[in-house]
Amino acid sequence: MFASKLDSIRERCSYRKTILPKYETEILTVLSFYPELDSTRIIFKEATIKASLNARPKVGSLFFRRRKNRTYVIRIKPNTEDSVATLDQAGFNAAVGVLGHELNHVVDYSNRSIFGIIGRLFNYTNKKGKRKYEAEIDRMTIEKGLGWQLFDWEDYVFNKSNAKVKYKAYKKDIYYSPEDLKSLINQGNPKN
């Protein structure tokens, strides 16, 4: 039964997507929450990056394609010895939660002009701007119905992963803690 549901989700959600087979179930599951991205080009790939995951538009598609034809890349850090918290060590729900967070970056970028995206980049030049932007993305994730999955990711990062103290301190400065997420989810209105 699950296989037939996965086939149905794959048929609907994999159009214009490059999906890593290793994370196919998690990626297809989270894509099913984002019908507005059904025709959006998204490449999921492993990459050596400092963060666990990140999402961004492909630079060439910003300049040479219309907004609806842009390509976005979600980069996933593979498990290495110097690793931060990684997707392959998190549970299914945690993986779905953080992938949902990254897809909300894609939703945000897809609704912006090139100048709006550049403005978002400026948010990342200071801690206050970065914190505000990531809080907005987390609230979007909760509004999509993925709050508990995002909670599982943050709980994994802070309490179960082998992430270094420095990485956990960075996460604490920028992102909601598991307790903050639980409070927002229980409020039922993440805009408060």
Model-derived regions: residue spans:
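Short alpha-helical catalytic segment bearing the HExxH-like zincin motif
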Residues: 94-102
